Amino acid sequence: MSCTPVSTKCNDIWIDFSCTGPSVSELQKKEPNAWAAILRSQKNQQTAEDDTIIGSICDKQGLCSKDEYAYSQYCACVNSGTLWAECAFAPCNGNKNAYKTTEQRNILTNKQCPSGLTICQNIAEYGGTGNISDLYQNFNCNSVINTFLINVMNHPFLTLILIILILVIIYRLMSSSAAKQNGDKLPPPSLIFSNLNNF
């Protein structure tokens, strides 16, 4: 079964890798070097050469840069875009056929995974319109918790709104603490800004 790529953007975090991709027997016939690399990965014997053979979308080379394999089970570690995929992304760390790079192997063997990571099994949604990308990502973590990650930094208007909201919150916190200390209230922001216009 072929996995049709929805996106070929480097480090997209939308995919759940539920598509198994070409069967193991197909992979053995079509890509014997890649299958040998996966077998070495299963035994923690992968090499830098194996990393190159498997590749990734970001590398633009190797097995995992090809459309039919990019979102298959074999590429769930190298193409997931998930931080610490080898530690906390079930399609990667829970799948023996998912190739782990030498760097990922070293993190696992040296027990360098951060503590308290939430295991995310599926990524259910990915979206964005216009020039806003990665606007929402719905992670189904531990089959219970939905975590929404919002990236507004790709859109200047949304970034400006976020900065204004932060400044308003800071002003309110400062004015309430100053009022408690002095026993009187600071003037409202509108009065302050109107006085600034008089200068």
From Swiss-Prot:
An annotated GO cellular component: membrane
Stimuli inducing this protein: Expressed in the late phase of the viral replicative cycle.
Domain of life: Viruses
Coiled coil: none
Keyword vocabulary terms for this entry: Glycoprotein, Host membrane, Late protein, Membrane, Transmembrane, Transmembrane helix, Virion
Sites carrying sugar chains: 131
Subcellular location: Virion membrane; Host membrane
Keyword check for Endoplasmic reticulum: no
Transmembrane region(s): 150-170
Keyword Glycoprotein part of the UniProt annotation: yes
Function in brief: Essential for viral fusion with host endosomal membrane and core release. Not required for virus morphogenesis and egress. Induces complete autophagy through the interaction with and down-regulation of host PYCR2.
Family (UniProt): Belongs to the asfivirus E199L family.
Protein name as annotated: Inner membrane protein E199L
Organism expressing this protein natively: African swine fever virus (isolate Pig/Kenya/KEN-50/1950) (ASFV)
